Amino acid sequence: MKQMSYVTRWLYSTSHKDIGMTYLGFGMLSAMMGTGMSVMMRMELSNGNSQFFHGNNQAFNVMMSGHALLMMFFFIMPVWMGAFGNFFLPMLMGAADMAFARLNNISFWCLPPALVCMVCSVLMEQGAGTGFTTYPPLSSMSAHSGPSVDLAMFAMHLTSMSSLLGAMNFMVTVLNMRTMGLHMVNMPLFAWAMFLTAMLLLLSLPVLTAAVTLLLMDRNFNTGFYEVGAGGDPVTYEHLFWFFGHPEVYILMMPGFGVMSHMVSTYSKKPMFGEMGMLYAMGSIGFLGFLVWSHHMFVVGLDIDSRAYFTSATMVIAVPTGIKIFSWLATIYGGELRLGVPMLFALGFLFLFTMGGLTGVMTSNASMDVAFHDTYYVVGHFHYVLSMGALFSLMGAYYYWGPAMFGLKYNRMLGEMHFWLLFMSVNVMFLPMHFLGLNGMPRRMPQYPDAFMGWNYMSSMGSAMSVMSVLVGLKSVLVQLENGENEELEMQVTPDFTESNLNREIRDSDLDLILTRPAEYHTYSELPVLTSNSHA
């Protein structure tokens, strides 16, 4: 292969692997920025008096808004969809590349300008202290007159464009680029997860785009969509935003569900228990996610019938989620369990995601949510689901597939240290938030009565511990990049039930397990043929 220049390879790239790597680097940069913002907030909250922002409560809310947007739109979504999805979906499909290689590249290059807009919105004038929901009238010109909210809106537009282009690419790839013999029902669960995530993005993002476009018009062109004085209604924005916002939670979680199935199956030396059940559960979660958005809005004055419906529909989501949890446990049960680093993160995910789900059942009740709404109970709940569910499955995916991406093994001791430090720190950080919420401490408040100080101090200690775990994780990555060729992993990754690719025919659809590490720049010179219905 002719040697490409650095600029040609990384700037004009059409290789799904190179684009995946750029997404991974971008996601890590955004994660560092978002973590820094969260640490500033926890430093402020470690004491009831003003600690860090010197009474500038707007700055606290700006940090909070920036933290949320960076972590969701610039870290978890790009790493899941862009890095792991781009890198491994064609390999799992037996495809040469993604369906639209140049579209793949432009969907990445929408993100750096979006990040610039996001950072500028934090730094310019008074910043966008609206929360990531940007509800009017707080986000209207009367409350935030500078350009900050507009810049945050532009950032959301650009990330939406990136995600929509990526989602179309993923859907076309899955529908049209499968290798011979690989039917939809036989696809690995990670490929199904990416397909369902792409469908959720395609259906929900246009609604967000419409909502923030109307907000931009209210701010700049004197329209009155959300202005009560002009005959508008701010609750319209809430309905539009949460119609996107709830599927967004499953967009962040769904790839983790897929990768969890791979990790649990591999490290239990068993095929996944109830594979079709897992598939239908993922589809059900995605479908139901569009029917429950108003559970975020129980206190805006919904009528009693609406509250009864949204409570019931939200509780129904617990059923397919429970099916997934018990199927993972059934796969582990009776298997030859090997506690490699990816499996530690998978077990951590199972425990923490279940905890987050249990607190979610409580907040789904319209009567109880009147007490929980806008307290730290909700903050604790969604961080258990996202900071622990999405993050632990993502870290597990890195340790599981990192050797395949780089061809370099990680240091197992550092990986285990990373897991235990992160596991302890996130529990110390987020468990006290539930107690604060039950006692009535409101969200988004930098100063509070001394009665709340004990649990807040404990939570801030957890935040400091999490910084240590991030440093250990970075050290683990650096050691892998510097010395990965010399590391030894005692735990063989390929499970016993994967068969060889004799005569280019293989009997299992987890194609990534039989490829070289790192995978070749062009993975398949000749496309593989699958001969079995092992996943049907």
Swiss-Prot record:
<dbReference type="InterPro" id="IPR023616">
    <property type="entry name" value="Cyt_c_oxase-like_su1_dom"/>
</dbReference>
<feature type="binding site" description="axial binding residue">
    <location>
        <position position="381"/>
    </location>
    <ligand>
        <name>heme a3</name>
    </ligand>
</feature>
<keyword id="KW-0460">Magnesium</keyword>
<dbReference type="GO" id="GO:0006123">
    <property type="term" value="P:mitochondrial electron transport, cytochrome c to oxygen"/>
</dbReference>
<feature type="binding site">
    <location>
        <position position="296"/>
    </location>
    <ligand>
        <name>Cu cation</name>
    </ligand>
</feature>
<keyword id="KW-0812">Transmembrane</keyword>
<dbReference type="GO" id="GO:0004129">
    <property type="term" value="F:cytochrome-c oxidase activity"/>
</dbReference>
<feature type="transmembrane region" description="Helical">
    <location>
        <begin position="341"/>
        <end position="361"/>
    </location>
</feature>
<dbReference type="InterPro" id="IPR000883">
    <property type="entry name" value="Cyt_C_Oxase_1"/>
</dbReference>
<keyword id="KW-0472">Membrane</keyword>
<feature type="binding site">
    <location>
        <position position="373"/>
    </location>
    <ligand>
        <name>Mg(2+)</name>
    </ligand>
</feature>
<feature type="transmembrane region" description="Helical">
    <location>
        <begin position="188"/>
        <end position="208"/>
    </location>
</feature>
<feature type="binding site">
    <location>
        <position position="44"/>
    </location>
    <ligand>
        <name>Ca(2+)</name>
    </ligand>
</feature>
<feature type="binding site">
    <location>
        <position position="250"/>
    </location>
    <ligand>
        <name>O2</name>
    </ligand>
</feature>
<dbReference type="GO" id="GO:0045277">
    <property type="term" value="C:respiratory chain complex IV"/>
</dbReference>
<feature type="transmembrane region" description="Helical">
    <location>
        <begin position="69"/>
        <end position="89"/>
    </location>
</feature>
<feature type="transmembrane region" description="Helical">
    <location>
        <begin position="240"/>
        <end position="260"/>
    </location>
</feature>
<feature type="transmembrane region" description="Helical">
    <location>
        <begin position="152"/>
        <end position="172"/>
    </location>
</feature>
<feature type="binding site" description="axial binding residue">
    <location>
        <position position="67"/>
    </location>
    <ligand>
        <name>Fe(II)-heme a</name>
    </ligand>
</feature>
<feature type="binding site">
    <location>
        <position position="446"/>
    </location>
    <ligand>
        <name>Ca(2+)</name>
    </ligand>
</feature>
<comment type="function">
    <text>Component of the cytochrome c oxidase, the last enzyme in the mitochondrial electron transport chain which drives oxidative phosphorylation. The respiratory chain contains 3 multisubunit complexes succinate dehydrogenase (complex II, CII), ubiquinol-cytochrome c oxidoreductase (cytochrome b-c1 complex, complex III, CIII) and cytochrome c oxidase (complex IV, CIV), that cooperate to transfer electrons derived from NADH and succinate to molecular oxygen, creating an electrochemical gradient over the inner membrane that drives transmembrane transport and the ATP synthase.</text>
</comment>
<keyword id="KW-0249">Electron transport</keyword>
<keyword id="KW-0106">Calcium</keyword>
<dbReference type="Pfam" id="PF00115">
    <property type="entry name" value="COX1"/>
</dbReference>
<keyword id="KW-0479">Metal-binding</keyword>
<keyword id="KW-1278">Translocase</keyword>
<dbReference type="InterPro" id="IPR036927">
    <property type="entry name" value="Cyt_c_oxase-like_su1_sf"/>
</dbReference>
<dbReference type="GO" id="GO:0015990">
    <property type="term" value="P:electron transport coupled proton transport"/>
</dbReference>
<keyword id="KW-0349">Heme</keyword>
<comment type="pathway">
    <text>Energy metabolism; oxidative phosphorylation.</text>
</comment>
<feature type="binding site">
    <location>
        <position position="295"/>
    </location>
    <ligand>
        <name>Cu cation</name>
    </ligand>
</feature>
<keyword id="KW-0813">Transport</keyword>
<feature type="transmembrane region" description="Helical">
    <location>
        <begin position="315"/>
        <end position="335"/>
    </location>
</feature>
<feature type="binding site">
    <location>
        <position position="246"/>
    </location>
    <ligand>
        <name>Cu cation</name>
    </ligand>
</feature>
<feature type="cross-link" description="1'-histidyl-3'-tyrosine (His-Tyr)">
    <location>
        <begin position="246"/>
        <end position="250"/>
    </location>
</feature>
<feature type="transmembrane region" description="Helical">
    <location>
        <begin position="461"/>
        <end position="481"/>
    </location>
</feature>
<keyword id="KW-0408">Iron</keyword>
<feature type="transmembrane region" description="Helical">
    <location>
        <begin position="273"/>
        <end position="293"/>
    </location>
</feature>
<feature type="transmembrane region" description="Helical">
    <location>
        <begin position="103"/>
        <end position="123"/>
    </location>
</feature>
<dbReference type="InterPro" id="IPR023615">
    <property type="entry name" value="Cyt_c_Oxase_su1_BS"/>
</dbReference>
<keyword id="KW-0496">Mitochondrion</keyword>
<keyword id="KW-0679">Respiratory chain</keyword>
